[in-house]
C-alpha cells in the first residue's frame, strides 16, 4: 500500500507522541518516588536558629525541612514527630543544604552535603517490602513512608537519620566548619549586621536561660555520640499497634 504525504505526517505525529509519553514516564521515575518527612532537631541546651535547611532533589526540585521546633527553642535531641503534607510523591534527595546560627559558640555554619543516594533508595525499598513505613499523614489520603531527621548537635556536628518502624539508619555524620555569613544570610526585613541578626535570631530566648548557658551548663556534652533511643522510645507504641492490627510489620 502506497503511503501519501498525509499518512506519513500522521504516522510521524503518532511516533512523536508515543516517544513523548515514554520519555515522561522514564524521567518521572515513579518507581523512585516515595512519601517522606524531613525534620530538624537540636539539643535543648544548645539553641540554634536555622536560616535554611532543605534537600535538593533530582530535576531541580527541593524539599524543605520542618525547622519550627528548633527555631522556637522547643526541640529535644533525637526526638521528632514525622508528618508530611505532600500532595504527590517525591524523588529521593541527593544533597542537603543547611545554614544556621549557633547561640552558645556564636558561630554561623553553612554547607551543601552529598547524600548516600544508593543507600537511601535501598532503605526505602527494603522498608516498603518489610512493611516498616510510618503513617506520615492522613490528610487528603493516607501517606506512608520514612522520616528523615537532621540532627544539629553542638560544635558544628551534624547527623542524618532515616527512620521507620523498628528502623533507624544513620546516613551521614559530619562536623561543619564555622563560616562568615553572607549579606543574604543576615537579611530580615532589611539588611542587618551580624550582631543585630544574632540578636533577632535569639530574641525569644529567655534571659534566665542565657545566664544558665553563660555559666557553662552542659558545656562538655557530646550530643553527636549520644544514642537517639528512637526505637527504644517507640517500642511500646509499635507493640500496641501490632497487637491491635494497626501495623503489619512482623518483628
Predicted regions and their residues:
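Short acidic/polar inter-strand loop motif in beta-rich domains
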Residues: 101-109
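Short beta-strand elements
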Residues: 109-137
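Hydrophobic membrane-insertion alpha-helices, especially the h-region
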Residues: 7-25
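Activation corresponds to long, low-complexity, non-globular regions
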Residues: 16, 140-251
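Tryptophan-paired
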Residues: 53-102, 249
Amino acid at each position: 500500500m502506497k503511503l501519501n504525504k498525509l499518512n506519513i505526517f500522521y504516522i510521524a505525529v503518532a511516533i512523536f507522541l508515543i516517544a513523548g509519553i515514554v520519555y515522561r514516564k522514564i524521567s518521572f521515575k515513579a518507581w523512585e518516588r516515595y512519601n517522606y518527612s524531613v525534620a530538624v532537631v537540636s539539643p535543648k541546651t544548645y539553641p540554634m536558629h536555622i536560616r535554611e535547611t532543605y534537600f535538593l532533589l533530582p530535576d531541580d526540585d527541593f524539599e524543605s525541612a520542618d525547622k519550627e521546633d528548633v527555631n522556637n527553642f522547643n526541640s529535644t535531641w533525637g526526638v521528632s514527630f514525622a508528618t508530611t503534607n505532600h500532595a504527590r510523591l517525591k524523588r529521593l534527595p541527593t544533597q542537603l543544604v543547611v545554614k544556621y546560627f549557633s547561640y552558645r559558640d556564636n558561630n554561623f555554619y553553612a554547607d551543601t552535603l552529598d547524600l548516600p543516594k544508593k543507600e537511601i533508595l535501598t532503605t526505602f525499598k527494603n522498608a516498603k517490602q518489610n512493611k516498616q513505613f510510618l503513617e506520615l499523614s492522613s490528610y487528603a489520603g493516607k501517606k506512608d513512608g520514612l522520616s528523615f531527621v537532621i540532627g544539629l548537635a553542638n560544635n558544628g556536628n551534624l547527623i542524618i537519620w532515616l527512620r521507620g518502624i523498628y528502623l533507624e539508619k544513620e546516613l551521614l555524620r559530619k562536623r561543619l566548619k564555622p563560616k562568615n555569613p553572607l549579606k543574604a544570610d543576615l537579611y530580615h526585613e532589611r539588611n542587618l549586621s551580624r550582631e543585630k541578626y544574632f540578636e533577632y535570631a535569639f530574641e525569644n530566648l529567655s534571659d534566665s536561660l542565657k545566664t544558665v548557658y553563660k555559666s557553662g551548663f552542659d558545656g562538655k556534652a557530646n550530643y553527636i555520640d549520644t544514642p537517639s533511643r528512637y526505637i527504644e522510645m517507640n517500642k511500646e507504641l509499635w507493640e500496641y499497634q501490632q497487637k491491635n492490627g494497626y501495623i503489619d510489620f512482623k518483628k
